[in-house]
Amino acid sequence: MDNLQWKYDMAGIKSAREQGYRRKIVARDISVSTGAKQYAYLLPPMYNLFLKQVHEKRDKNLYEVIDEKSPVRLYFDCDSFDRDEGGYGLDLDCKTSLKLFHDLLKNFILFLNPNSTANMKAHITRCIRQDKPNKHSFHAIYPGIVFKNINELKMFVLSFAYHLFEDKNDMRLAFKKQGKNKTLGRAFFDLAVYTKDRCFRLPFQSKKGDSAKLIPLREITLEEIENNICQPEDFVRKPDNVDTSIGDLLSAAVMEKYTGVKLSTYVRAYQEGVIKEKIKTKCIEKRNGSKKIKITTPRLEIEWDQMKIPGVETVEIREDKDFLQYFDPVELRGGFYSLYIHLLKDICYFLPDEVLKQWMGHTNDKKANYLIKSNRKKGAEYAMTGGYALELLAKIYGRCNVRDLRDPIPKPTNSFRNTTRINVTPDRWRPIEVSDMKKFFIDSQVRDLKTNTYNDCGMITAMADVDYGEKIALSKKLKMDTKKKCQFITGQMGASKSTGVMDYMVFSMISSIIANAMVIVPRCSLAGQTVKKIYNTYKEMISDKDRMKKIKNKRKIVINPYFSQAFTIGGLQEIYDELTSEITTTDTCGTICVCVLNSISKVRSHVFDTIIMDEPVTCVDNFYIDSEKKQKIPVKNILEKKGNTIAVTDLMIDMLMKITRNANQLIFIDAAFTEDVIRLCETLYWGAYTMQGTVDDWRKVLENEGVDQSNIRHKIKRIKDENILIRKWIQNKKEWNYDKKTDTRTIISTTEIDHFRLFRPIEYICVYDKKITRPIYTHIIKYDCKQTMMNKLLDDVREGKKLVVYCSVGKETASIINTINSMTSRECIVLPKVGGVTAKSLKGKENQLDEYMRSMEVVVVSSVLGTGTSYPEEGLFDAAYMFCKVTYGTPQISDMIQLSARVRATTTRTLHYHITTSTSGHKPNGDALKNSDYHGISFKDHLDKTYTSRDHLHRVHMSRPSLASEFMRNELQQSFGHVIDETLEKKLPTHETNSEIEKEKHSDGKRKESKMAQEIDKHHPDVYTDVMATSNRNMTDEDGTKYQTIVRHCVVRTNNTTEPDRTMDVDWDSSQGTSGEIFHRPVTVDRSRITEQLVATPGPSTSRKRKLSDDDEYEKYDSGIEDIETDVDEEEEVQNKL
């Protein structure tokens, strides 16, 4: 129809209709070879004119598009074939088959509803093909039976097929089908035409390039033409006014009789009958009364250019309520309802009810009101930013035209330098090669053992609860004769920091250099791995007999795991039993305790010579999280719950400080120390002696911080009292003069030792390994689009690469696994092993983790994998991917970087990552925008400040994507920088974005093509080139005049090619066509970089699509499902008239 606007593609149609725009849609063929179509809306004023033109046969290629959510009449698409010599087709002729089908349909309806009064009059059209006289095609429509939507109709038709063929009530309408698959069968009525947006041919219409039309069996008037349409215009525009009572009764009966039956959309034919087969479809479950039915619900993209929302070119949002003036609620509800709902969910957080109701027009929209109420409850704890509304405006008006002029989230007053990774330099950190670590520690311990001055021993002076004599006796009894000291050990990830320390600890324990030790780790899974690592190191050492001969006072060791469900981890019970069984009553043994911070109260002894804390900041984070979750007492009052949490926290802190106070040596290991963490650990080392400096110094510090005088006086008094208590334990160092003649001693001088000398200066050590020739990742690629990175991941899976994927969200893990499995099941012959490591899948299977990781070809892991777990094997995986989402409740960026280093050596040494932040994040309060001064506060205060600062930084990243992206880039490069030698200089990995790589590839391709074009022009001037470049060419006109022209190179054909290729003409001339002339459009033939336009001559032919065999096994997807009832007696008479 020329008066229709054929400008919509199907994407635009789907988008508008999905958002609630209800109009009848028609389609027409525009291509012979591909079957492509154009679509148009059929508005009410044009509907009658449309029916008139269809009745007058003015158009040839029109279809109606079946709307999925609108009522639809019962319709069938039937095909029958006369039986041939190969057994293909029906034994019945077309008239008998049609009558039999109609009778079986009547019987099935009465089977479902014995009291049915349905009008069974059918309107049938028939298509006769001259090139295939044995094929008979019918369309049958029953106007008296209307279903609520296409899904209920599909359930009815599939149940009808199940009743006939699966229950074998009547097998006469099922037959074998010709083609490659001889067992593939089909039914008289097609079962595959009840899909979304199905194009159903209208009466008197033919396909493009074919003259075979659908002709009614009896003559119809203009008033009757609408009975031959499946969905009249008012069915789509006013669905509530359509009577679907008969269809509802049939649907209810189908649900009752066929609930739980797996229905199929095609059949298989064998000698004994027809067997159904299950088809995999993407669907969701919806309830229909008390029953569940499955319907397909594909998600559609929004065509933003179709949205017409009133506004101006430049959008300025100065207040929250300004959002509403750029959105018309009536337009959104009518055409884009899902956008309307999502917009309400976003802006309802910060707009009052009165404003929203006034904007909504006080409509009684129950769904919208319910969503507003429920989403306000969910977001009551934090404020939203209106991110979805801003994004919607940006897509409609353009990102550069939308300005958010509201009070912005306050910028941080500093760069959170105390919360970011420190820069390791030789002036502060002492470089030590990993192979020299044990020697360094052992030599230090041996020197300390030769020093027996107890008056400045840190372990003694730290014990303030006993007198001096008891401290000396206790220190001698435990052989803790070393001075109190502390070491911070850092280095690049994979430099064997923890392994070196464990090696030193085990050797010192065997050699009786240290009495006992405690290892504190962040997680239970890592604690189990630490126990096994210590055990293996111990066994390896005692098996070296030459080495053991050099040790005089050898001891055996016992490893005690103190953490929740310790002995449920495979192998720990056996290790403990083996070590304890080797110890007799006469043996002296050393004890190594391995625990997590939360389980420190389970430790029986409170005196350990050496304390080793691995990943201290992760210990702190896990401790705070678990202390809130592990409340076994049911608490109804929130204040009581907080009180219990504080009590648990204080108890753990007191236990930790008591153990570290009694220790002689503290070792902290981390690959990414921050100033906050260093100060926290230093405070733990100093213990009660944290208060440093004179009273005047403290007064100046407090005044500079703006503390009022009353608080200053209170703090100064507390400092004085604490200094007095400290000075009570300061001993006087006396120098004596001994007189041999008189055998007397006199004091020469007395020197007071202040508390600064009770502890050794802290040592900062950076470990490097010369054996490591390159870092974990040498190349880091950032993807701005998540889908682009997902496509790259799927390409690697197709190529058979082994991949490890890190995710910050558990749901993301499941989604990626499902996507990979879906792709591989469709495209891969050999399916790869794809698995996931989450908290749920890992529970109770911790001992199988290593074997599971090594057996998978694609493994998707979440943060549950934990810090400290590592897989150093070269080539275990080919590449790594990281999906990082920064939002409430997800791991922090630094934690995700630690997670991405669990696999130490991928084949390509490449990390692909994508980072996204929540569009509705928290607005950080004032405390999150400044650093606190930690000078002179207690360990508990340090602990709270460290945790709070990290949490505040995470919230700032949530609300500032650019800051989060920059922080991620810097942290990745610093974390995976390779320390080369004792200079501690880092060789940083390269960092690129995917867009930069694609741009560079495009530029390289341009340069190569340009060079190739120049070479071709130089050596073969008679050839046009097909590369994207230009050059000057000398040309000669017909009269001999020479001139120069710029030619776009295209390797197509040589200049001396005179005869065009007539291959397509020969094919068309030899094809079997139907009656009438067929005019084909020009066809482009691509044959190995040769491009020519071939224009076909008019003549009898048929389209390439129709030339394909109708016997092909995939025809079931193209034909359609239809049923028919009719008065067939008039058929021959009508055909003679035509």
Swiss-Prot record:
Q: Name one GO molecular function term.
A: DNA-directed DNA polymerase activity
Which segments show compositional bias classed as Acidic residues? 1110-1138
Superkingdom of the source? Viruses
Q: Name one GO biological process term.
A: replication fork processing
Region entry Disordered, spans:
985-1015, 1094-1138
Would you tell me the protein name for this molecule?
Answer: Uncharacterized protein ORF49
